[in-house]
Amino acid sequence: MSPFLSFSRATWSELRNSVPMTLSEEDLKALQGINENLTMQEAVEVYLPLSRLLNLYVQARQSRNSVLHQFLNNDEHAPPFVIGIAGSVAVGKSTTARVLCALLSRWENHPKVELVTTDGFLYPKKELDQRGIMHKKGFPESYDMKKLVQFVSDVKAGKPELEVPVYSHITYDITEEVKKVDRPDVLIIEGLNVLQSGMDYPHDPHRVFVSDFLDFSIYVDAESNTIEQWYVERFLKFRKGAFTQPGSYFSHYTQLSEQQAIEKAQQIWRDINGINLTENILPTKERAQLILRKGPNHLVEEILLRK
């Protein structure tokens, strides 16, 4: 018997329960990724019911905190509700994270919602080169996990004015910018490996993971060959957009012909992203509390919710 309840898109959309849509078409356009076509229908039928579910979870957590405050006779700031969103490169998890961030921030009982991507915790390019793992960017070993876990731990401890490094997809490196995170009501952490746990490292049983701090977890899923196709399509769009910007690490790819670019993207997928998906990301899927399963057209077709 499956540990998940399965919902068709139509059945799931009914769980919206008349919650009003608070985002406009313009809002959605600003939130979607380069290779996504996020429609109002998708937002209403998939993400609005999900925001309602998450709101109920947050409310339950806030009620529990108020009991604790009553018992301790204090009004200390409650720790944030932390949501993790995982999935492959090019599957659309960043768009999912941005849409949920926007929707959740419009609920009156938790208006302060922050979104942090784990990209900011990648080792700088120089260090990846020194370690000889530049070709493994995105793999667990390419992240400063100690720094990432410390950040999430500090957020949960209620520490104010935390700083998160900012990553640039143009320079392919950590920048000098920082993002401030100051005791949000809800924190969304989006990244490839946020659902990894001690089960992935049996030789190191005392290690602490981001997943240890999550209150709710989402995995954005699709067939591997479908994601590969999306990756190639995204690569071709970047080739005509982001790769042409001054200082772009990938500017040399703009000189490739269309066919050469397709072959290069397929090679990168085959040698890096596909392996990372199979070895490190996909094994964490079953740990998620909710799985959004997408079809070839980028639309969510099935929702799996842990019982």
Swiss-Prot record:
> What is the name attached to this protein's record?
Pantothenate kinase
Task: Just give the chief location class.
Answer: cytoplasm
Q: Belongs to which family?
A: Belongs to the prokaryotic pantothenate kinase family.
Indicate which residues the UniProt annotation says bind ATP: G87, S88, V89, A90, V91, G92, K93, S94
Keyword Kinase belongs to the record: yes
| Biological or metabolic pathway of the protein | Cofactor biosynthesis; coenzyme A biosynthesis; CoA from (R)-pantothenate: step 1/5
The organism is: Vibrio vulnificus (strain CMCP6)
Q: Which Pfam families match?
A: PRK
Q: What is its EC number?
A: 2.7.1.33
